[in-house]
Amino acid sequence: MQTHEIRRRFLDHFVRAGHTEVPSASLILADPNLLFVNAGMVQFKPYFLGQEAPPYPRATSVQKCVRTGDIEEVGVTTRHNTFFQMAGNFSFGDYFKEGAITLAWELISKPQSEGGFGFDPERIWVTAYQDDPEAAEIWHRMAGIPKERIQFRDGKDNYWDMGVPGPGGPCSEIYFDRGPAYGKDGGPVADEDRYLEIWNLVFMQDVRGELSPKQGHPPIGSLPKKNIDTGMGIERVAMLLQGVDNVYETDLLRPIIGKAEELTGRRYGAEHASDVRFRVIADHARTAAMLISDGVNPGNDGRGYVLRRLLRRIVRSARLLGAEKPVMAEFMQVVSDLMSPSYPELATDFDRIRTVAVGEETAFLKTLTTGSTLFDNTAAAVKAKGGTKIAGADAFTLHDTYGFPIDLTLEMAAEAGLSVDEEGFRSLMAEQRRRAKEDAAARKHAHADLSIYKELVDRGATEFTGFDELTSEAHVLALIADGVRVPTATQGQDVEVILDRSPLYAESGGQIADRGSITASGLKLRVNDVQKIAKKLWVHKTTVEQGQITEGDVVLAQADPAWRRGATQGHSGTHMVHAALRQVLGPNAVQAGSLNKPGYLRFDFNWQGQLSEQQKADIEAVSNDAVGADFPVNTFVTDLPKAKQMGALALFGENYGDEVRVVEIGGPFSMELCGGTHVQHSSQIGPITLLGESSVGSGVRRVEAFVGLDSYKYLAKERALLAGVASSLKVPSEEVPARVEQLVERLKVAEKELERTKIAAVLSSAGKFVEEAERVGRVLLVAAAAPEGVAAGDLRTLATDIRGRFGSEPAVVVLLGNADGKVPFVVAVNKSAQEIGVKAGELVGSFGPSIAGRGGGKPEMAQGAGSDPSGIPAGLAAVRARVAEIAG
């Protein structure tokens, strides 16, 4: 039975039993506790916790899952996969243990002709939690499982939770006995290779708390309703129903191995070391394609690093198997062909998936070549000294200087019979991060001692009033000058002012700080910047322009209205551009960073490849259409689960509190978690003009734009520029493109004609060189200085022409040029001279030192350049001497 049919039978069985079929969620969810979705119940977590009312009492799904905690074991054994499909059925306060067990038994035992899986009931074993005799009794009573095939296990094996705070409960696992050939008797407690788990039924009833050293994630309460969460590994069931020994032999993985055999010329099953690499390729190729499809791009941390690691392991495994050419495009194609019947997005988004994977392969091949050589040298040096461990400093150098990832160093070290001082490596990495943080903090806070703020932070947060007003009365809590608390500051002095409340926005979320003032009777301070300390204390960096400020003063803090207006236009404009990007490019265009300041925005997003002119035009058009629609801009505070349910975009890696602020523009057009300041209606943003798009790193693109008045000024400048060009060309503005294109074509024609004239002039001297050829032994030699100013490319043309004029007569042509202080040279040797023993590449060594030059080539043609024109005569003499040695 093919995997796609197994998947379909599972879903159909539960739909017939009153379940709603729910599509797989993305592997990427806005859950700060999860790197990737790792279980079928993840998308239903709010229902299990009672945070949201489920829209259906019963559900069934086949969820894409990724677990990467044991990447190193993939391929070494046949039990590990990083990607798998988890089929599940779920009950939200509807049926419980008896219903779950009955439905599971029907599907696994029903004959295939009746829509079931047709497992032999006599080979089914089950386990139950040690404190759950009820489940065992149901299995015996409802399914007829003999008591001797029902085994009890402790919480380590038969109590399920997510490994993070959340729902959990006792579980009952279903096993299939593969027979004595796979291990010893005794049931699952004796041998889990022979007795293979195929389904886990979790009786969800508890809430698990934060991690405790002694208790793990301890139960901290009961769920509002008892629920059912089950998980069946589709790949394992496929292995059993297809009658193969392991998942790598199934219909969704073996073809990838087959493609690897084709590309490497090696055969799977011939030796263990090669088989490991074949399995790594098969597993990782599938996982990588699924991750890219769901919006992950290669990076240096988090999800991006996991993907990068998977792709690089594929490349290295293929190289070790003998692949000499790039392989990623073909592996991605096989995965798409295999998986798209169940996940059609792999086919519709294939071009992007392939581009991302191939881009990482291309980049890594450069690193792999250099890094492998350096690693081999390091490993050889360790072994030469009788050592067994690569020093942490060496691993750090490979990583930091040459971009060789530590996980690859560990893997290669193990293959070489060596270990790595991981503690030393991580210590150096930690030291590097510490220095970077200290440097950043010192730059940000003018080398201040950050401990000086601790007392102030402990006293409480600055109340930010800037969402509601631009002017607020406040008390001066502290003054800091040159890193020291001071009681007062006077005119001309730079001082940091800490207030109990402030309307000035502190730099965060990509939005730069407000500018403004702090005033009182006879007092005025200019606010140059506002920074946050510990995310709660507003530090106003100011200059005293008039009077004296004293700790304890009551002052008036004011944000500059024009500055704030421009900043809000920039920040709201960023949300518009983000929404437009996702509308034009799709949901995989995920924010990677931003900068918002008055009149300007910069937005970084995950995307592979340059945007087309049409895409940029569409993004600008969608953004400005939304501006013109005069959408209302609403902000509200809600809890994180509610915000996610509403569809608000959250950035992975951000730490959100229990309550979050949502900024909504035009209802579904844009909804993001955001703490910044915004306009009240989208029309207040003004025109948005994209300035350009560029790359800022692997898989990250950047767009920049002007907004509001700055956008108008930019467009006015562009209009004036166009008018000037039109005037110079003496055509109307609308005819400028056609006129420029016409002039460009004329220029191309003129350049070609000039090139032909130049070549003709160069070749006109060929006859003179032939006439002046000198006989040196058995060859005719032209060794001369070329006409001054002849470029390297023209030298080659001239030398080739001269060589051809000698026919079958053995001939050698050496021309040394002199252009802009450089000495380009060309050596041309015909076939007759080569047969005598004269080789062009070897001749370079005879005259190269005279002109401080280097070069090389093939026996018939060599070229290069030197930097010392004064050595040309000596170089030509050296050529004559060397030719005489060979052909004399």
Curated annotation (Swiss-Prot):
Keywords: Aminoacyl-tRNA synthetase, ATP-binding, Cytoplasm, Ligase, Metal-binding, Nucleotide-binding, Protein biosynthesis, RNA-binding, tRNA-binding, Zinc. Its cofactor is Zn(2+). GO terms for molecular function: alanine-tRNA ligase activity; aminoacyl-tRNA deacylase activity; ATP binding; tRNA binding; zinc ion binding. It catalyses: tRNA(Ala) + L-alanine + ATP = L-alanyl-tRNA(Ala) + AMP + diphosphate. Its EC number is 6.1.1.7. InterPro entries: aa-tRNA-synth_II/BPL/LPL, Ala-tRNA-lgiase_IIc, Ala-tRNA-ligase_IIc_anticod-bd, Ala-tRNA-synth_IIc_core, Ala-tRNA-synth_IIc_N, Ala-tRNA_ligase, Ala_tRNA_ligase_euk/bac, DHHA1_dom. One of its GO terms (cellular component) is cytosol. It is found in: Cytoplasm. Binds 1 zinc ion per subunit. Zn(2+) binds at residues 571, 575, 674, 678. SUPFAM superfamilies: Class II aaRS and biotin synthetases (SSF55681), Putative anticodon-binding domain of alanyl-tRNA synthetase (AlaRS) (SSF101353), ThrRS/AlaRS common domain (SSF55186), Translation proteins (SSF50447). GO terms for biological process: alanyl-tRNA aminoacylation. HAMAP family: Ala_tRNA_synth_B. Belongs to the class-II aminoacyl-tRNA synthetase family. Consists of three domains; the N-terminal catalytic domain, the editing domain and the C-terminal C-Ala domain. The editing domain removes incorrectly charged amino acids, while the C-Ala domain, along with tRNA(Ala), serves as a bridge to cooperatively bring together the editing and aminoacylation centers thus stimulating deacylation of misacylated tRNAs. Catalyzes the attachment of alanine to tRNA(Ala) in a two-step reaction: alanine is first activated by ATP to form Ala-AMP and then transferred to the acceptor end of tRNA(Ala). Also edits incorrectly charged Ser-tRNA(Ala) and Gly-tRNA(Ala) via its editing domain. This is Alanine--tRNA ligase. It comes from Nocardia farcinica (strain IFM 10152). The lineage of its organism: Bacteria, Bacillati, Actinomycetota, Actinomycetes, Mycobacteriales.
